[in-house]
């Protein structure tokens, strides 16, 4: 009898599944971006990040983390405090020397090249040392320890608000040497008023990292796993190539 009852129970028809309702929205990944950043790194429209390396990289990392990217644009001076307070989860394309604070740093992964570019209206410098005593356009608030090491007191800065403002001054003939990222120079040559310049002098090559908030929603270990995935899948190279 027990077996018969069990068979009957097994054969009993099941009712329709209970409705599950809409899927819960994905958790967010709040990505900080400096509002002073320009293309190819970032483009803002109506205070919203809409394009650039920061945009594409944030989307790629969020996807690997199973989260929805939310971009928070802030002025450079407010970046560190917002990250320390957990108002954002991370900021990428930085290195520790640029962002002092109690942050967890990801593994280095995004290739970057700092260069000095010189226009062709002046003699071509053969080495960085040839720039000693000559004015070099820089961006206000950015530090260049490698140039300081080579030039010492001969590192003469002229600070501007952005890389693009400095390159526009070069177009206008107002200055002759600019320190910038190779990617910025390449993008300007592709999309802006083309500069007549010598091949740039390399200052430094390095790999950009992500600073992860100690009070954020994601751990640096999880971010590193996501980075390993996008590097292995070639997405870092694809993002970089998109803006060359």
Regions found by a protein language model. Name each.
Residues 68-75, 155-169, 200:
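Short beta-strand-to-loop elements that line the ligand-binding cleft
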């Amino acid at each position: 009898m027990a077996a018969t009852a069990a068979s009957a129970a097994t054969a009993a028809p099941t009712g329709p599944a209970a409705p599950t309702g809409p899927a819960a929205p994905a958790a967010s990944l709040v990505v900080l971006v400096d509002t002073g950043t320009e293309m190819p790194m970032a483009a803002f429209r109506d205070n919203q990040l809409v394009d650039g390396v920061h945009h594409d990289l944030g989307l790629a990392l969020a996807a690997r983390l199973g989260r929805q990217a939310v971009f928070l644009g802030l002025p450079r001076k407010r970046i560190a405090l917002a990250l320390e307070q957990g108002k954002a989860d991370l900021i990428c394309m930085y290195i520790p020397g640029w962002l002092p604070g109690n942050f967890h740093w990801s593994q280095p992964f995004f290739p970057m090249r700092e260069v000095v570019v010189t226009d062709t209206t002046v003699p071509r410098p053969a080495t960085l040392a040839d720039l000693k005593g000559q004015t070099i356009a820089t961006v206000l608030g950015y530090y260049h320890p490698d140039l300081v090491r080579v030039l010492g007191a001969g590192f003469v800065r002229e600070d501007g608000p952005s890389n693009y403002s400095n390159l526009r001054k070069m177009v206008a003939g107002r200055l002759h040497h600019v320190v910038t990222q190779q990617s910025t120079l390449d993008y300007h040559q592709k999309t802006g008023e083309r500069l007549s310049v010598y091949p740039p002098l390399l200052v430094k090559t390095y790999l950009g990292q992500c600073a992860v908030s100690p009070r954020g929603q994601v751990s640096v270990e999880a971010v590193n796993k996501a980075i390993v995935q996008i590097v292995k899948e070639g997405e870092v190279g694809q993002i970089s190539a998109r803006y060359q």
